[in-house]
């Protein structure tokens, strides 16, 4: 049996110099110091629980509640078995499994940064090609493949690798195909449906799997963050009905939308849902009133991450700050990003929609519509019908100060 290659956690904060770490620690302590509240107003903010919308779709959605019996809790070490498959009609030959893995494994560091060090993908690579029992063209591997078809693919892959892998030791499975299997085109996520037979190996159910396709060579490490996000319960933010623009809902913001977008850091709403952002970092204005909030950019772990104004049982407006650092080092515009959340909307139908501060502007070169959506100091967003107003009062290198009002 060949020794597996394990991707080790560095247990560090990548690419941050010591002075910046010290500054981040100071930011973390600021809310605890007298006279430095993150939210100020005539009335105290409401409890964050008043802004925690409940999901109603029964699957991946924007509800704050996530069914841990269905979806993986994204904290600590997440043990992943990475296996490599070829097919009778697409033989890997001398293709290097290690080279294929190198296209994906940097996703562990990306997710570590995006989760503020709360979640680590502990990937063990079983670098041996195992043969699937059917041709690559026999799996119905196209958009719209059924859950049953996908489960059959996962089952065949797990069965083929079972002699070398003890699947009971892992939380989830990554299946990597030979690049010669062009029929394995895209990368879907498998989530076990409770009450069904599912896939069993070594006395354990395989509850979560990502079956990579040839699009991994286009998206690279961030496809890991997108698809693994589904195992955590996050929905797709791009439009299943492509229309004129399949990324019309959120543009390049959040990796659950456009994987290769300019600002792929998870929305603060997602970070809160996943447990990476604490209640203490959320300002909620559910009752009539106003709050002045000092937002720290979502790319940093400390400080207040978002202000939320609910407008109904399943809807809310959120404002967060974005900066051109870390996972968002390619953003086209920085500032206060405002978006509407609707936890009753299904995946792929626009459960989050970014509000565009500059709807008539022409995007800069290499940027897309909505990439310039953030609001700048002196600008404001208003929804008169919902009684919501969000004003950007000032900005600095760390974030924005905003005033949220609910009438």
What does each model-found stretch correspond to?
Residues 2-3, 34, 48, 53-55, ...:
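Non-catalytic C-terminal accessory/binding modules of secreted extracellular proteins
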Residues 92-93, 185, 266, 329, ...:
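Short acidic, gly/pro-rich beta-turn/loop elements at beta-sheet edges
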Residues 4-39:
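Secretory targeting and sorting signals
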Residues 167, 172-174, 180-328:
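Extracellular hydrolytic enzyme modules, especially secreted metalloproteases
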Residues 38-216, 225, 242, 379, ...:
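Zn2+-dependent metallopeptidase catalytic core
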Residues 86-89, 179, 260, 323, ...:
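Non-catalytic surface loops within mature trypsin-like serine protease
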């Amino acid at each position: 049996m060949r020794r597996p290659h394990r991707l080790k956690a560095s247990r560090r904060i990548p690419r941050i110099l010591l002075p910046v770490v010290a500054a981040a620690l100071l930011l973390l302590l600021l809310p605890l110091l007298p006279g430095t509240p993150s939210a100020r107003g005539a009335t105290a903010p409401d409890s964050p629980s008043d802004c925690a919308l409940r999901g109603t779709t029964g699957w991946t959605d924007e509800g704050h509640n996530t069914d841990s019996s269905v979806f993986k809790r994204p904290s600590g070490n997440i043990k992943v078995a990475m296996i490599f498959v070829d097919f009778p009609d697409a033989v890997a030959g001398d293709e290097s499994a290690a080279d294929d893995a190198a296209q994906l494994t940097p996703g562990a560091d990306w997710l570590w940064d995006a989760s503020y060090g709360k979640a680590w993908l502990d990937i063990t690579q079983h670098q041996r090609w195992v043969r699937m029992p059917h041709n690559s063209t026999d799996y119905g591997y196209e958009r719209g493949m059924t859950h049953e078809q996908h489960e059959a693919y996962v089952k065949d892959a797990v069965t083929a690798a079972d002699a070398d892998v003890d699947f009971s030791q892992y939380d989830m499975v990554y299946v990597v195909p030979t690049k010669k299997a062009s029929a394995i085109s895209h990368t879907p996520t498998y989530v076990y449906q409770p009450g069904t037979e599912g896939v069993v190996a070594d006395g354990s159910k395989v509850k979560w799997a990502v079956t990579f396709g040839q699009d991994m060579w286009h998206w690279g490490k961030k496809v890991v963050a997108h698809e693994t996000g589904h195992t955590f319960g996050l929905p797709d933010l791009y439009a299943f009905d492509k229309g004129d623009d399949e990324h019309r809902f959120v543009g390049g913001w959040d990796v659950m939308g456009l994987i290769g977008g300019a600002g792929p850091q998870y929305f603060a709403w997602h970070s809160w849902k996943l447990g990476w952002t604490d209640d203490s970092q959320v300002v909620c204005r559910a009752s009539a009133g106003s709050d002045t909030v000092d937002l720290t950019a979502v790319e940093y772990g400390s400080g207040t991450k978002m202000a939320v104004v609910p407008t109904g049982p399943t809807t809310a407006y959120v404002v967060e700050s974005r900066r051109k650092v870390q996972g968002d080092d390619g953003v086209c515009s920085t500032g206060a990003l405002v978006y509407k959340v609707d936890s009753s909307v299904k995946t792929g139908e626009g459960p989050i929609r970014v509000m565009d501060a500059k709807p008539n502007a022409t995007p800069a070169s290499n940027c897309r519509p909505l990439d310039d959506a953030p609001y700048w100091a002196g600008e404001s967003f208003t929804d008169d019908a919902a009684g919501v107003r969000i004003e950007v009062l000032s900005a600095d290198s760390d974030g924005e100060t905003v005033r949220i009002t609910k009438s």
